[in-house]
Amino acid sequence: MIEKMIREARSQRASDIHISEGQAVYLRIDGKLIKSDLELSDEMTRKLILSLLTKERQESIWRGEDADFALETSDGNRQRVNVFCQQGRLAAAIRLLNAKVPTLSQLHLPPVLQNLANEPRGLILVTGPTGSGKSTTLAAMVDYINHTRADHILTIEDPIEYVYEQDQAVIHQREVGKDVCSFAGALRSALREDPDVILVGEMRDYETISAAVTAAETGHLVLSTLHTTGAANTVDRIIDVCPVQAQNQIRIQLAGVLKGVVTQCLVPLIDGGRIAATEVLTGTDAVLSQIREGKTHQLGSVMQSGAAAGMHTLDYDLAKLVSRGLIEKKTALKYAQDKRELEQCIF
């Protein structure tokens, strides 16, 4: 039943499936929730969701915890599944992933991301709201490294979303809750495992942030995600998560290791589907100086004048998509950070 449901959702270009006892099945298509034609009784829904869970995961659900895991179907595709309870009833959110990691060009991402992936060391962050494609962008960067240089790549994920086929690189993928207890613990262990590149699925807390920055300081290329919008907000968020007594130190450390921040959101195309609109901040001397001095409010101006270093604001990228006839102006205005800047950028 679940495989049939997933196949049908994929045929409709859905990105997510929502299943809940007592409710209809919903699909997210091009960012919008659409009611599915599939009808399930409460009993069928409950059995379907329970069939996805191991005994241990069922026990965690009854303890009031969520279950977050990957599901591979017979066609080789993977799905990220989150099962939870609401009002005493079971529910599941299923994110549909591709079996094959897309390339940076297939994702229509700017060439500067390839330049960032070529960095031998430092910290690269991909940020944006939930469902904005952060994990897919990181996977494309990791796979680019896999096909271009003989590095040892270590990923720490919760759960593992894409499984890489080794090419030039040696790749080890560790899953939180299965192979390791936590992101921070896995990062500390990683420094003894001779990696060149470390992918951290998400920097959720101070301990993980501190360990990731330390790994970048010690000569590794660290890639991770944050649920933030805008490059300046990302830097501020990292610092704000830290204890007050550690904030100045983390600011100095960031200024020493940050190579780039990529913020993205998925916007609807005129002809259907969605495309990533991006904001890119690269670790130039001017950027790192502003971070070191606590002047993150000036990073927007640096990005506006930093095209030669691959930088651009989200509003500039949205304006470019409008000018190319890919998205409507009203769509761009909906996602814009500064509507006046967007109007000025449309050409």
Residue ranges and their predicted role:
Residues 1-347:
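Short, flexible helix-loop junctions that flank or precede catalytic/ligand sites
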